[in-house]
Swiss-Prot record:
This is Uncharacterized protein MJ0086. Belongs to the class I-like SAM-binding methyltransferase superfamily. Cation-independent O-methyltransferase family. The keyword S-adenosyl-L-methionine applies. Its EC number is 2.1.1.-. S-adenosyl-L-methionine binds at D202, G227, D228, F229. The keyword Transcription does not apply. It comes from Methanocaldococcus jannaschii (strain ATCC 43067 / DSM 2661 / JAL-1 / JCM 10045 / NBRC 100440) (Methanococcus jannaschii). Signal peptide: none annotated. GO terms for biological process: biosynthetic process; methylation. Keywords: Methyltransferase, S-adenosyl-L-methionine, Transferase.
Length: 372
């Protein structure tokens, strides 16, 4: 046996593990950089020695860490008198510094928390029922804060500016942000149309977070309504109802409530994920992770971002038409978020495939429908 080679070389398997291991090391290096607040110290140029002293870190390891971050385009370098100096790249100052208005450090920490599930995958596989239940009362407020930090740095502005072109929006007097969470969309809409009164409807514990954002942005025309949209009345007389990434966003019963709550000629703007099929390993991994947890009170589907009673995109559009809506357009969110006439480098540095939520050929769509 010692002198006989196997029928196949181990190269493929070794290469697979080598590639995965390399990416895992980068992941933990990035986590360490954020945990150590490394980027907070690199607003101006510093040497590896200076940074090592500040962080009380090993100099050799710090030198390599900075070289790696430089290769990842998160920091830039210059050489002065044979010394290498490093400072944050512009995109790092925007998104990876705590004092930035567009910091996404909080959403990024969800990766660091979620990786623990993969480290304990054997336990989850064998004992899912014992470790998968999640307290919705604590879950949603935490998610709301992260979604606020995430959306305000790109998606929020893109959606607001896109919808501002509609005459129906310009003439609207009353808007409902249904299951609006942080309420940033309602706040933004109220800034674009000063005659618009906006209402954010969500669960009581979530609304407590909403109120903090309303106060932060001094949004005088934004108000809150507490309730469960599956069970409670959502009100009437709205000119616009806006819906974004919520569990009932593809549910026909919620769509009917929306129709009944809108004025004639009113707009229903619904931004949701409509996954229709699994297309390879990335979908398999995401869907597997989706099934790690089961928040109490939410009946999740097998596929990521789906829930019991959901309709697929085509069936949902047909249902809206049967209710009495006219579909004005269906916007591909990856295209909407991927266009920036002011930045030629956008597709390289901040395109949807690099964001926390979107990728090319994203199943996320924004439906704009009008009640006839």
């Amino acid at each position: 046996m010692l002198l006989k080679s196997p029928d196949k070389s181990p190269e493929k398997i070794l290469k697979l593990f080598d590639e995965v291991y390399s990416k895992a090391r980068i992941f933990y290096l990035l986590r360490t950089a954020i945990d150590l607040n490394l980027f907070e110290y690199l607003s101006s140029f510093k040497t590896a020695k200076e940074l090592a002293e500040i962080l009380d870190a090993d100099l050799i390891l710090m030198e390599y860490m900075l070289k790696i971050l430089n290769e990842l385009d998160l920091i830039e370098s210059k050489v002065v008198s044979e010394r290498i100096y490093y400072k944050n790249a512009e995109i790092t100052n925007i998104y990876l510094k705590k004092d930035s208005n567009y910091s996404i450090i909080n959403p990024i920490y969800s990766y660091f928390e979620n990786i623990k599930n993969w480290e304990n995958l054997a336990d989850i596989l064998k004992n899912k029922s014992n470790c998968s239940n999640m307290d919705v009362d604590n879950f949603f407020p935490k998610v709301v804060r992260r979604m606020a930090d995430e959306c305000k740095c790109w998606e929020l502005q893109k959606v607001l500016n896109y919808m501002a072109k509609y005459e129906e929006f310009k003439n609207a007097k009353k808007l409902l942000d249904l299951a609006g969470g942080h309420g940033l969309y309602a706040i933004g809409f109220s800034m674009l149309n000063r005659n618009l009164k906006c209402y954010v409807f969500d669960l009581p514990n979530v609304i407590e977070e909403t109120k903090k954002f309303i106060k932060k942005y001094n949004a005088k025309n934004v108000f809150t309504i507490t309730g469960d949209f599956y069970k409670d009345d959502i009100g009437k007389g709205y000119d616009i109802i806006f819906c974004s990434y919520n569990p009932g966003g593809k549910n026909p019963k919620i769509a009917e409530k929306v129709y009944n709550a809108l004025n004639e000629g009113g707009l229903f703007i619904n931004k949701q994920f409509f996954p229709d099929k699994e297309e390879g390993i990335e979908d398999y991994i995401n869907n597997m992770e989706w099934n790690f947890s089961k928040p109490e009170g939410l009946k999740k589907g097998k596929i990521r971002y789906t829930f019991e009673g959901d309709l697929n995109l085509n069936d949902y559009l047909k249902y809206l038409e049967d209710l009495g809506f006219k579909i004005l357009e269906v916007v591909d969110m990856s295209e909407l978020l991927g266009l920036d006439e002011n930045s030629s480098s956008f597709r390289k540095s901040a395109n949807p495939s690099d964001s926390l939520r979107f990728k090319d050929n994203s199943p996320a769509k924004m439906i704009v429908a009008k009640k006839l």
